Curated annotation (Swiss-Prot):
Localization, UniProt: Cytoplasm
UniProt keyword terms in alphabetical order: Cytoplasm, Isomerase, Porphyrin biosynthesis, Pyridoxal phosphate
Family: Belongs to the class-III pyridoxal-phosphate-dependent aminotransferase family. HemL subfamily.
Record gene name: hemL
InterPro entries reported in the protein's UniProt record: 4pyrrol_synth_GluAld_NH2Trfase, Aminotrans_3, Aminotrans_3_PPA_site, PyrdxlP-dep_Trfase, PyrdxlP-dep_Trfase_major, PyrdxlP-dep_Trfase_small
Residues recorded with modification N6-(pyridoxal phosphate)lysine: K258
Protein name: Glutamate-1-semialdehyde 2,1-aminomutase
One Pfam family in the UniProt entry: Aminotran_3
Major site of localization recorded for this protein: cytoplasm
């Protein structure tokens, strides 16, 4: 254990301020970051890592992008927080509406975290419908509100408050539309909303089967329940209009975060104004936040979204993904090792299971011990993946060919080492 991490453990529970950072799922001492630039971070021991976590998907442009940094420095001279509506909020809202192609009957409410945004979306659904039940899907993560933390690894850490929330939340298997439809046929009149990730990123990367997302949204329309698409991970990452655009769907409520803030804390709820105008002060559903719409986060977010709009940005990301991951897939296929590499856009996961998972139960069949050995080997070579077998890793536009070539070789060598192919 490093000296700094020992000191961190004196001050923070588990030495961290968010649990997965402790790296216990991969059985390593977590690195303590000293600085970061582009696709790498350097730890307190002066070791360089190629970063495929990127602040859990927030840094699609890499660390310390010069345009984002310059805008923040300039904005800081005008003030770090106002507690009032600012010009920066309005300009950023205009940018988002243009980028997402939102109609004029939509509105947005800025917040600071994804958890705040999902909690607000659920509060809207319950407040407007007067119904108590929220449906989510097993393995999908929507923040740390008790409403969302039903299944492992979260349930055993949430004690009595979670038990009180359980009767109001139903968790169903992802991708099982017949079961979902059966439940909605029985309980739909009590369901305020259904919240879902369009592409799962917190049980590893798991894709929806054909027509699942469309079916969920259509069923919500039929029962008068709100469909809530959590695009905290996929928004601004998988396409200009997010996953909603890729799947050609129109959920009732959209939730954004991560990339939205350009590396600073920002999130948002977006919906038609007949929904959003139920929020205070226009309506009676309360939501507030001291740092909501923080001017520096708005500035960083606006630059981040502008960079995503540059010609060929998503084509560039797709090329990076293809060049980096295809040779690894080829190695897995030709050697016959029991590993599945799942990728979607610039998200990817290694499942130590020969079969592609469709839900949490499938993902949990993975060989966790083998994943840990793989992770530890890659980490020792300076490749930092998201430190859990059930978390997505991320590519960014900042990943250079040199870094990708090195990481590709390191990951292949690590797979060979785990399965004694060398």
């Amino acid at each position: 254990m490093s000296h700094l991490f020992s000191k961190a453990c004196q001050y923070f529970p588990g030495g961290v301020n968010s649990p997965v950072r402790a790296c216990r799922a991969v059985n390593i001492t977590p690195p303590i970051v000293a600085r970061a630039s582009k696709e790498v971070f350097i730890d307190s021991l002066d070791k360089t890592f190629i970063d495929f976590c990127g602040s859990w998907g927030s840094l699609i442009h890499g660390h310390s992008h010069p345009k984002i940094c310059a805008a923040i420095r300039q904005g800081l001279e005008r003030g770090s927080s106002y507690g009032l509506t600012s010009e920066q909020e309005i300009l950023f809202a205009e940018e988002i509406f243009s980028y997402l192609g939102l109609e004029t009957n939509y509105k947005i409410r800025f917040m600071s975290t994804g958890s705040e945004a999902t909690m607000t979306a659920v509060r809207l659904a319950r407040g407007i419908t007067g119904r108590p039940i929220i449906i989510k899907f097993l393995g999908c993560y929507h923040g740390h509100a008790d409403t969302f933390l039903q299944e492992k690894p979260f349930s055993h850490t949430s004690l009595d408050t979670l038990d009180l929330a359980h009767p109001l939340t139903l968790s169903l298997p992802f991708n099982d539309f017949p079961l979902f439809q059966t439940v909605m046929n029985s309980l739909g009149h009590k369901v305020a909303g259904v919240i879902f990730e369009p592409v799962c990123a917190n049980m590893g990367v798991i894709l929806p089967v054909p027509d699942f997302i469309e079916g969920v949204i259509q069923t919500c329309q039929q029962t008068g329940s709100f469909s809530i698409m959590d695009e905290v991970v996929t928004g601004f990452r998988v396409a200009q209009g997010g996953a909603a655009a890729l799947y050609h769907v129109k959920p009732d409520i959209l939730v954004f975060g991560k990339i939205l803030g350009g590396g600073l804390p920002a999130s948002a709820v977006v919906a038609p104004k007949d929904i959003m105008d139920h929020l205070a002060p226009e309506g009676k559903i309360f939501q507030a936040g001291t740092l909501s719409g923080n001017p520096l986060a708005m500035i960083a977010g606006k630059v981040s979204v502008n960079l995503c709009r540059e010609q060929g940005f998503y084509t560039q990301l797709a090329t990076i993904e293809q060049n980096f991951l295809s040779p690894i897939e080829h190695m897995i296929r030709t050697t016959g090792i029991p590993v599945t590499l799942v990728r979607y856009g610039s998200l990817f996961s290694f499942f130590f299971n020969p079969n592609r998972p469709n839900n949490l139960a499938d993902a949990q069949l993975s060989d966790i011990e083998a994943f840990q050995k793989f992770y530890q080997s890659a980490f020792s070579k300076g490749v930092y993946l998201s430190p859990s077998p059930f978390e997505a890793s991320f590519l960014s536009a900042a990943h250079s060919m040199e870094s990708l070539d090195y990481a590709q070789t390191a990951l292949i060598e690590s797979l060979e080492q785990v399965f004694s192919l060398v």
